[in-house]
C-alpha cells in the first residue's frame, strides 16, 4: 500500500503547481519559500490524508475548496514561546534608556507574530522597564498573515510549555489562571494591537523603534529575503533595534548599516 512518503522526486514538478493554485485561488503566496521547508511541511498534510503524491493532492484541491484552508495552516510556522532566545530581550533591555530619552514612548513591530507570545513578551519587558510616562506612549503592533494565529493571539491563553522562560514572579504579575492554562492580563494585552499583514505583498509600518522578525527568513529564498528585508529596513528608524532569528543573517546590501549588540543573540542597532 502506498503512503505519503512515496511523494518522490518524480512528482516534485507538481509542487509549484500546488503553490500556484494556492496563490491564484486564495492570494496566499508561498512560491518563493524554500522548497525544502515547504516539502517537509506539506508531507505532514499528505501523511494525514494518506495521499501518496503531490498529483493526488492536486486532485483533492480541485474537489474540495476547503482544503485550501488546511494547506495554508499546514504551511504556516506557529512555533513560539514567551521570551524565546532570552538574550535578545536582555540586549533590548539595555537599549531602552537610549530609545526613550526625554520620556518618549516606543513604537514596536512584531512582524510574523504567530500566536502572540513574542508580542506580549515585548509588552511585559516595556512594562517592567519604562517609566510610566514612556509606557503610556508605547504600543506594540503585532502582525501575521494567518487569521487563525491572530485569533489565538487575541485570546491570549497559553499552556505551561509556552511559559518556560517566564519567572514565577512575572507569571503571577502578568497572567491569571484560565482552566488548565494561563491568560495574559489586560494591562499587557492593552499594549498590543494585532492585525493581518503579508510581509511579501503589503506595505510595511513606518517610524518603528523596535522591530522583531525572527525565524521567518529561514523559509524564504535569497531574492525574497532581500525583498522583504528592504521593507523592514525602511520601517525601522535610524538608531532603532532589529531582532532576527539565531539562524538568520543580515542580507549583504544592508549589513554595513547595522551594528550587532553583542554575542549570543541576533539583535542589532541600525546605524545607517
Question: Language-model features: where?
Answer:
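A short glycine-rich, Lys/Arg-flanked "PGG" loop and its adjoining helix->strand segment in the class I
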Residues: 226-238
Amino acid at each position: 500500500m502506498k503512503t505519503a512518503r512515496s511523494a518522490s522526486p518524480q512528482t516534485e514538478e507538481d509542487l509549484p503547481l500546488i503553490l500556484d493554485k494556492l496563490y491564484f485561488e486564495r492570494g496566499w503566496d508561498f512560491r518563493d519559500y524554500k522548497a525544502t521547508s515547504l516539502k517537509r511541511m506539506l508531507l505532514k498534510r499528505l501523511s494525514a490524508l494518506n495521499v501518496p503524491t503531490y498529483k493526488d493532492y492536486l486532485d483533492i484541491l480541485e474537489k474540495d475548496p476547503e482544503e485550501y484552508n488546511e494547506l495554508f495552516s499546514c504551511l504556516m510556522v506557529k512555533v513560539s514561546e514567551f521570551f524565546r532566545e532570552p538574550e535578545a530581550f536582555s540586549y533590548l533591555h539595555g537599549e531602552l534608556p537610549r530609545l526613550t530619552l526625554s520620556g518618549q514612548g516606543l513604537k514596536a513591530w512584531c512582524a510574523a507574530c504567530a500566536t502572540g507570545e513574542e508580542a506580549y513578551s515585548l509588552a511585559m519587558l516595556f512594562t517592567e522597564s519604562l517609566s510610566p510616562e514612556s509606557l503610556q506612549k508605547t504600543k506594540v503592533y503585532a502582525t501575521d498573515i494567518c487569521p487563525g494565529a491572530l485569533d489565538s493571539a487575541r485570546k491570549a491563553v497559553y499552556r505551561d510549555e509556552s511559559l518556560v522562560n517566564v519567572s514565577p514572579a512575572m507569571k503571577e504579575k502578568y497572567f491569571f489562571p484560565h482552566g488548565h492554562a494561563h491568560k495574559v492580563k489586560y494591562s499587557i494585552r492593552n499594549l498590543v494591537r494585532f492585525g493581518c499583514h503579508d510581509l511579501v505583498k503589503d506595505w510595511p509600518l513606518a517610524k518603528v523603534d523596535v522591530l522583531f522578525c525572527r525565524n521567518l527568513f529561514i523559509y524564504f529564498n535569497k531574492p525574497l529575503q532581500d525583498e522583504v528585508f528592504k521593507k523592514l529596513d525602511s520601517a525601522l528608524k535610524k538608531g532603532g533595534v532589529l531582532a532576527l532569528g539565531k539562524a538568520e543573517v543580515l542580507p549583504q546590501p544592508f549589513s554595513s548599516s547595522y551594528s550587532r549588540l553583542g554575542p549570543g543573540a541576533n539583535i542589532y542597532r541600525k546605524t545607517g
